[in-house]
């Protein structure tokens, strides 16, 4: 989404060039796109590809005893919400932006090297939502040691002040019956 009435087109150009540069780093072509008018700038990409069926790693193939490895600290959703509400300081904002800009390529390469059984991303359903999905599909259970989970700086303070995405509240409502 882009609001050309409030933002100069040079901002849109910078956003698009940034996406193209990251796609080049990832070794993928950019083949098209679309833009919608929206008050709030939004940018995203969809990647389509093919994979050897013998090398697919899914989210429903975990095995009891597997370790859970997070490749980035949690908290971008909360910090993004704080940014939208003008309640994030400069350092915390840039830490979240830098995390979101970082490719997962090295994590993917490490995953292949060690031969993981399953993987998933942590997006809108949060750690608990995605872990519940993985456990249900794999017919396993999981234990999380809270103090071992990496979080971005400032996330707890923001959450304590009620700055959380709307989806977080829905995720909690969904998960509280399934998590002890």
Give the ranges of each region predicted by the language model.
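Secondary-structure boundary elements
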Residues: 25, 63, 106-114
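Active-site phosphate/oxyanion-binding loops
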Residues: 2, 83-95, 160, 174-179
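Glycine-/charge-enriched secondary-structure boundary and capping motifs
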Residues: 6-29, 36-41, 113-114, 119-180
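Glycine-rich anion-binding loops of enzyme active sites
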Residues: 1-88, 151
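Long, contiguous hydrophobic alpha-helical segments, chiefly transmembrane helices and signal peptides
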Residues: 41-43, 47-48, 73-74, 100-104, ...
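Short amphipathic alpha-helical segments, especially helix-boundary/capping motifs
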Residues: 80-85, 104-109, 129-131
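Active-site glycine-rich loop that binds ribose-phosphate moieties when present
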Residues: 46-56, 91-111
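Glycine- and other small-residue-rich loops at beta-strand/loop junctions that grip anionic moieties
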Residues: 34, 60, 71, 96, ...
């Amino acid at each position: 989404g882009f609001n050309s009435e409030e933002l100069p087109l040079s901002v849109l150009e910078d956003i698009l060039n940034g996406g193209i540069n990251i796609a080049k780093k990832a070794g993928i072509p950019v083949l098209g796109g679309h833009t919608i008018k929206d008050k709030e700038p939004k940018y995203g990409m969809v990647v389509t590809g093919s994979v050897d069926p013998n090398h697919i790693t899914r989210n429903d193939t975990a095995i009891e005893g597997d370790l859970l490895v997070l490749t980035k600290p949690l908290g971008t959703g909360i910090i993004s919400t704080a940014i939208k509400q003008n309640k994030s300081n400069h350092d915390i904002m840039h830490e979240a932006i830098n995390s979101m800009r970082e490719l997962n390529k090295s994590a993917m390469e490490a995953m292949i090297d060690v031969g993981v059984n399953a993987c998933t991303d942590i997006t809108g359903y949060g750690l608990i939502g995605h872990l519940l999905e993985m456990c249900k599909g794999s017919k396993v259970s999981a234990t999380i040691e809270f103090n071992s989970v990496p979080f971005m700086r400032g996330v707890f303070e923001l959450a304590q002040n009620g700055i959380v995405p709307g989806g977080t509240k829905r995720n909690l409502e969904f998960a509280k019956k399934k998590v002890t």
